[in-house]
Regions:
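Anion-binding and metal-coordination hotspots
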Residues: 1-213
Length: 213
């Protein structure tokens, strides 16, 4: 997984985890991950699999557009600024940027914004129209945002669980056991190295909680 972003690895990680859990008669019901695993594709996969996930949306996500409301039925943005010209930003198509993200573009006409007193503030000094871009996976980001905000208490609890159980592992292995590098050649040997380190970590953790005789 080292040559990919975390979000690109989520599907394979989930499948491997499910296989391991099934061998022990355990069903995957909830999934916790940090924002690095957030992507439209990852959230779409989890939704399709009906997995109840708690993953903070990535940094560029915006749940609301200040001064604009979205008309889902007719697929356009409406300017709602009291001092503005109430322009409509119509859907203009989809475009993939240099980073590989496909977005939907919404744009007003120059005529609608031409004499608006907020044009320069809203559009910029040289631009004559307003443009907004949304991810093609916006519905999945919105669904996750709604879950995290409507169930804020439980979502925060899940963050604490993740912080206590998942995030300290790599820090412990690197800082306390000095596993700053894998001293093996090849992916298979590196995988064995990490598996043994994980096994040792889990065994030490287990021994802390068993009843002492």
């Amino acid at each position: 997984f080292a040559d990919k972003r975390d979000s690109q690895c989520l599907e394979q990680i989930v499948e491997l985890t499910e296989e391991n859990l099934k061998e022990n008669g355990i069903e995957l019901q909830e999934l916790l991950a940090d924002g690095g695993y957030s992507s439209g594709e990852a959230l779409a996969y989890l939704h399709e699999k009906n997995i109840n996930a708690y993953i903070p949306n990535f940094g560029q996500y915006k749940s609301e557009r200040e001064g604009f409301t979205f008309n889902k039925e007719e697929n356009y943005y409406q300017c709602t600024k009291p001092e503005g010209n109430q322009a409509k930003l119509l859907f203009k198509g989809e475009k993939t940027d240099s980073k590989g993200y496909t977005k939907r573009t919404y744009r007003s006409s120059e005529t609608d914004c031409k004499n608006c007193p907020l044009r320069e503030q809203c559009c910029g000094k040289s631009t004559k129209f307003k443009k907004l871009d949304d991810s093609i996976h916006k519905e999945h980001y919105d669904r996750m945002h709604q879950k995290l905000t409507q169930n804020a208490t439980y979502a925060k609890k899940m963050v604490r669980v993740r912080s206590k159980t998942v995030e300290p592992v790599i820090g412990t292995l690197v800082n306390f056991t000095n596993m700053k590098r894998v001293n093996t050649r090849g992916i298979k040997n590196a995988n064995k190295h990490v598996l043994m380190a994980s096994l040792t970590y889990n065994l030490k953790k287990y021994l802390r909680f068993i009843t002492k005789k």
